[in-house]
Amino acid sequence: MAASASPMASQLRSSFSSASLSQRLAVPKGISGAPFGVSPTKRVSSFTVRAVKSDKTTFQVVQPINGDPFIGSLETPVTSSPLIAWYLSNLPGYRTAVNPLLRGVEVGLAHGFFLVGPFVKAGPLRNTAYAGSAGSLAAAGLVVILSMCLTIYGISSFKEGEPSIAPSLTLTGRKKQPDQLQTADGWAKFTGGFFFGGISGVTWAYFLLYVLDLPYFVK
């Protein structure tokens, strides 16, 4: 009985294993139900995507000045341009080698001279015969108000006898003389120069427009 059962058991075992293998290796079918024809000679290719670090370094357009974020300023193609640096260094407020009094006179002359035109053309008496006088007086009054504001700022920001609060190092680390404008005495000189220059600019504009009677558009 055992001898006759063993061939039957081996036959059943082989049939079960072949059936399970055929189920696992079932040929896939398409949408129409027809099986896909897999050619045994067809080679399937594959590729792998890898992220490779570039050897070329990238440059930031905007970065902290001198690479130090604690300075609180950014270096851009505009602010770090030699042309912009040359222009700013020639403005009166940034010419640290010039006396604060002369810097104030220069700034005041420009403001006083160019303030007359808007007050003459846009003032309340622009359509009367007193437009020139009223506009010049209004410009002079604005110069006085600005001078008072500069005085208030100097009193609240600088203390008498204290050294300049301006930095003594350039952005490249070179030593320089601190700007004397950032002191109480220097700011007082700048304010006085601004007042004198502003009144002089208003007077000069009025003289050119209404004394010499030059053919300017703002008349």
Curated annotation (Swiss-Prot):
Keywords: Chloroplast, Membrane, Photosynthesis, Photosystem I, Plastid, Transit peptide, Transmembrane, Transmembrane helix. Residues 51-134, 213-219 are stromal. It comes from Arabidopsis thaliana (Mouse-ear cress). This is Photosystem I reaction center subunit XI, chloroplastic. The chain crosses the membrane at residues 135-155, 192-212. GO terms for biological process: photosynthesis. Interacts with CURT1B and PSAO. Belongs to the PsaL family.
